[in-house]
């Protein structure tokens, strides 16, 4: 049976980005396990490893394949599939990794990011701000999915708290138990779309995906009765096709979400707007005279908790110590794998 890769998100742009040599085939990475990968092709799934050449030329871990990447495969003499090339990425969801400047790629080539947060004991708007920061920087559309609505007794209060930190971001309230809100997810799950599910451990990502699949493919565990939290189940990233023709990427719960690069101006739009009114262009909003942001805090327009969260994320973002040239190089490496790959894409674009 021939697999239709359009249902896995294949586009004409992807096909143009990858030049296949004789005998090579196109595929998309649907699973990653240490140094080998699961790849879906028109002929079905293959297990593959990167070639020595690709590994040697990789300038950083970001240049290695990740779940969601489109790749070219070849077969060696022993019929072992090898990854020869990676297509330029249309979007990259990444987070900072402890003691590493290059960050960790979570998923690539995604259209939408479902930021899942449960409405029970897991509810935390400061954590939501972190997820929004990496989501805005990814190039994909963030959507907030509030799960376990059936367990919530103060929904209106929580919705106001979410709205205060997520202006312009769609928010969906749902419950797998009652079916509430599940229809609102469908517009993002049409043929060719790829949606990544992110969120802390136990918020119900796998349970929600199983409901969308119509069968229990992903392992789940019940809620703990002592603290009303779900148990962490997913241990690796995987891309799964839905009956609707879309693909979803389930990701392990992230206990610590370090910020590598992120668009704080999107997540904290009101603070970014106020900052333009500060007396000094390099105002840190701590003790400088003429600070419009601190003035807003004093009158209650911006909460002190919101400002503290903004400042904390600023401090920990790894690009704080980088100059503009280094930041540009880091983003090129993450999206294209290097300047040479970016040049090839630009040359093809101008020819077209």
Curated annotation (Swiss-Prot):
<feature type="binding site">
    <location>
        <begin position="199"/>
        <end position="207"/>
    </location>
    <ligand>
        <name>GTP</name>
    </ligand>
</feature>
<dbReference type="GO" id="GO:0042274">
    <property type="term" value="P:ribosomal small subunit biogenesis"/>
</dbReference>
<dbReference type="InterPro" id="IPR027417">
    <property type="entry name" value="P-loop_NTPase"/>
</dbReference>
<keyword id="KW-0694">RNA-binding</keyword>
<dbReference type="GO" id="GO:0046872">
    <property type="term" value="F:metal ion binding"/>
</dbReference>
<dbReference type="Pfam" id="PF03193">
    <property type="entry name" value="RsgA_GTPase"/>
</dbReference>
<keyword id="KW-0699">rRNA-binding</keyword>
<comment type="similarity">
    <text>Belongs to the TRAFAC class YlqF/YawG GTPase family. RsgA subfamily.</text>
</comment>
<keyword id="KW-0690">Ribosome biogenesis</keyword>
<keyword id="KW-0342">GTP-binding</keyword>
<feature type="binding site">
    <location>
        <position position="278"/>
    </location>
    <ligand>
        <name>Zn(2+)</name>
    </ligand>
</feature>
<keyword id="KW-0479">Metal-binding</keyword>
<comment type="function">
    <text>One of several proteins that assist in the late maturation steps of the functional core of the 30S ribosomal subunit. Helps release RbfA from mature subunits. May play a role in the assembly of ribosomal proteins into the subunit. Circularly permuted GTPase that catalyzes slow GTP hydrolysis, GTPase activity is stimulated by the 30S ribosomal subunit.</text>
</comment>
<protein>
    <recommendedName>
        <fullName>Small ribosomal subunit biogenesis GTPase RsgA 2</fullName>
        <ecNumber>3.6.1.-</ecNumber>
    </recommendedName>
</protein>
<dbReference type="InterPro" id="IPR030378">
    <property type="entry name" value="G_CP_dom"/>
</dbReference>
<feature type="binding site">
    <location>
        <position position="283"/>
    </location>
    <ligand>
        <name>Zn(2+)</name>
    </ligand>
</feature>
<dbReference type="GO" id="GO:0005737">
    <property type="term" value="C:cytoplasm"/>
</dbReference>
<comment type="subunit">
    <text>Monomer. Associates with 30S ribosomal subunit, binds 16S rRNA.</text>
</comment>
<dbReference type="GO" id="GO:0019843">
    <property type="term" value="F:rRNA binding"/>
</dbReference>
<feature type="binding site">
    <location>
        <position position="285"/>
    </location>
    <ligand>
        <name>Zn(2+)</name>
    </ligand>
</feature>
<dbReference type="GO" id="GO:0005525">
    <property type="term" value="F:GTP binding"/>
</dbReference>
<dbReference type="GO" id="GO:0003924">
    <property type="term" value="F:GTPase activity"/>
</dbReference>
<keyword id="KW-0963">Cytoplasm</keyword>
<dbReference type="InterPro" id="IPR004881">
    <property type="entry name" value="Ribosome_biogen_GTPase_RsgA"/>
</dbReference>
<keyword id="KW-0862">Zinc</keyword>
<feature type="binding site">
    <location>
        <position position="291"/>
    </location>
    <ligand>
        <name>Zn(2+)</name>
    </ligand>
</feature>
<dbReference type="InterPro" id="IPR010914">
    <property type="entry name" value="RsgA_GTPase_dom"/>
</dbReference>
<feature type="domain" description="CP-type G">
    <location>
        <begin position="100"/>
        <end position="257"/>
    </location>
</feature>
<keyword id="KW-0378">Hydrolase</keyword>
<keyword id="KW-0547">Nucleotide-binding</keyword>
<feature type="binding site">
    <location>
        <begin position="147"/>
        <end position="150"/>
    </location>
    <ligand>
        <name>GTP</name>
    </ligand>
</feature>
């Amino acid at each position: 049976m021939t697999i239709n890769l359009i249902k896995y998100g294949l586009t004409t742009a992807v096909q143009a980005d990858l030049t296949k040599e004789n005998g090579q085939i196109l595929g998309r990475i649907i699973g990653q396990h240490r140094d080998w990968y699961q790849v879906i092709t028109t002929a079905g799934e293959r297990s593959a490893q990167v070639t020595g050449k690709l590994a040697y030329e990789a300038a950083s871990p970001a240049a290695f394949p990740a779940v969601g990447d489109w790749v070219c495969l070849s077969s060696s003499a022993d019929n072992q599939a090898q990854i020869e090339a990676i297509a330029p990425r249309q979007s990259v969801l990444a987070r900072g990794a402890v003691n590493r400047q290059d960050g960790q790629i979570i998923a690539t080539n995604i259209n939408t990011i479902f930021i899942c947060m449960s409405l029970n004991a897991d509810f935390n708007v400061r954590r939501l701000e972190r997820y929004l920061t990496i989501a805005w920087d990814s190039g994909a559309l963030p959507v907030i999915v509030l799960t376990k609505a059936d367990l919530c007794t103060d929904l209106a209060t929580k919705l106001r708290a979410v709205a205060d930190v997520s202006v312009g971001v769609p928010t969906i309230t749902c419950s797998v138990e009652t079916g509430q809100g599940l229809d609102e997810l469908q517009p993002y799950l049409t043929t060719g779309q790829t949606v990544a599910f992110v969120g802390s451990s136990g918020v119900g990502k796998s349970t929600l995906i199983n409901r969308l699949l119509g069968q229990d493919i992903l392992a789940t565990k019940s809620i703990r009765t002592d603290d009303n939290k779900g148990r962490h189940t997913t241990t690796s990233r995987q891309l799964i096709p839905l009956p609707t023709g879309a693909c979803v990427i389930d990701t392990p719960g992230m206990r610590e979400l370090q910020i590598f690069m992120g668009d704080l101006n999107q997540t904290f739009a009101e603070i970014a707007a106020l900052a333009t009114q500060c007396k000094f262009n390099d105002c840190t909003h701590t003790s400088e005279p003429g600070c419009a942001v601190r003035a807003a805090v004093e009158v209650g327009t911006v909460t002190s908790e919101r400002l503290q969260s903004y400042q904390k994320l600023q401090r920990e973002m790894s690009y704080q110590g980088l100059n503009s040239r280094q930041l540009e190089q880091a983003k090129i490496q993450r999206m294209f794998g290097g300047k040479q790959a970016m040049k090839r894409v630009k040359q093809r674009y101008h020819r077209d």
